[in-house]
A protein has these predicted regions:
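Active-site core segments that coordinate phosphate-bearing ligands/cofactors
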Residues: 1-128, 137-161, 168-180
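Glycine-rich Rossmann NAD(P)(H)-binding loop
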Residues: 131-132
Length: 180
């Protein structure tokens, strides 16, 4: 029941083995937060694409000198989300600039992604993660993901619909074995 409450689903592979998938849609939350930041700090909607990781700021976040106050606005408050963000202290107006508030958003979204990934991973020894979608171009996200997933191999793909493509390749391979 815990998996279902956190939107982690179990599927059956073509080899009759259980495959877990944790569905997590960060894009809508990101769009919502960017819109809010753009409004507060009077920035163009594409301004965030110019932001590189601020290593000093990130270091302060990791060692607790800066508290992460991000709180998701559009993501369902599942038990996992409630564990990560027990209270809503998110107020982007208190940050000195767009960049600081943006790093808070990406910090929170990265933590959500990592928790979702680890939920799906369960006890599996897998240490290779494939990432596709719009976040592969977000350098702050990638930097934080590498830190939170130290010991994992991260592969990034620009290929659209990578999961669907991977499934299609697997089915094609299986069909070819039966036909030949």
């Amino acid at each position: 029941i815990s998996d279902l409450q956190n939107d982690c689903l179990n599927f059956l592979s073509i080899h009759s083995k259980t495959v877990k998938a944790s569905r997590f849609f960060l894009g809508y939350e990101m769009d919502h937060q960017l819109s809010r930041l753009n409004q507060i700090f009077k920035k163009d909607e594409r301004y965030y694409k110019k932001i590189n990781p601020d290593l000093t700021l990130i270091s302060k976040m990791f060692d607790g000198r800066i508290e992460n106050t991000f709180y998701p606005a559009t993501i369902e408050k599942s038990p996992m989300v409630k564990d990560l963000f027990p209270e809503d202290k998110w107020n982007p107006e208190v940050y000195a600039n767009y960049e600081e508030a943006y790093h808070q958003v990406i910090w929170g979204l990265t933590r959500l992604q990592v928790a979702s990934l680890k939920l799906a991973q369960g006890n599996s020894p897998i240490r290779k993660v494939y990432i596709d979608g719009g976040f592969v171009h977000n350098q702050v996200f990638i930097h934080l993901l590498r830190h939170f997933l130290e010991g994992y191999t991260l592969e990034f793909s620009d290929f659209p619909l990578g999961s669907a493509y991977g499934a299609a390749l697997m089915l094609e391979e299986t069909n070819n074995k039966f036909i030949n």
